[in-house]
Amino acid sequence: DRERTVFAHFFEHLLFEGSKNIGRGEFMKIIPANGGTFNANTSQDRTYYFETFPSNKLELGLWLESERMLHPVIDQVGVDTQNEVVKEEKRQRYDAPYGKLLKVLNENLFKVHPYKDQNIGKMEHLDAATLEEFMTYHKTYYGPNNAVLIVAGDIDINETKELVKKYFGDIPSSSDVVRNLPKEDPIEETIKA
């Protein structure tokens, strides 16, 4: 939605808030307490979340990720908290000189494709968004038919498949996501910005 450009990046932050079974802020305590590390990232094409755990914590990692997809807490407290976090990230990274350089570069390379916009989105879109819109976004885009789960390391394949089925098998598919992105005309001239 061109009027809600901020949602993908915003969800990268919001889905660390907690779930029905994980208290607010507990994601970030559970993982290091079990020898793991974590992070997330949003690009123009995808958002990814990852945890790295000792292999004997595989089930914990799968449970955490299934909670993020199936039972996230999307409430006004989390939205308000992460609203400020995302705005601060924009000020520190995107409003800095190198961030502005990338903005100008993309605006000159792309005229109609969404790549012309910064992947952090527009803050006025964030401010205008309603709680219901955030809930609808999660329901639309966070389903197994729009996700890839990667498990690597010192694991037993058959056991891992059973654990994946246990934690992800009952997650309902979201709507099919149709991506009708506009085509750019080739750049046939020198662009000076």
Segments from the language model and where they lie:
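M16/insulysin-pitrilysin zinc metalloprotease superfamily fold
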Residues: 18-21, 52-83
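Active/ligand-binding-proximal structured segments within catalytic/core domains
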Residues: 1-30
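Non-catalytic beta-strand/loop surface segments
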Residues: 23-57, 93-146, 170-193
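Divalent metal-coordination and catalytic microenvironments
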Residues: 9, 49, 65, 86, ...
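Solvent-exposed coil/turn segments that connect beta secondary-structure elements
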Residues: 19-20, 54-56, 84, 91, ...
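Non-catalytic, conformational "gating/processing" segments within enzyme and secreted inhibitor domains
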Residues: 83, 131-167
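Short beta-strands and strand-coil junctions in structured, solvent-facing domains, enriched
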Residues: 1, 71, 157-158, 174
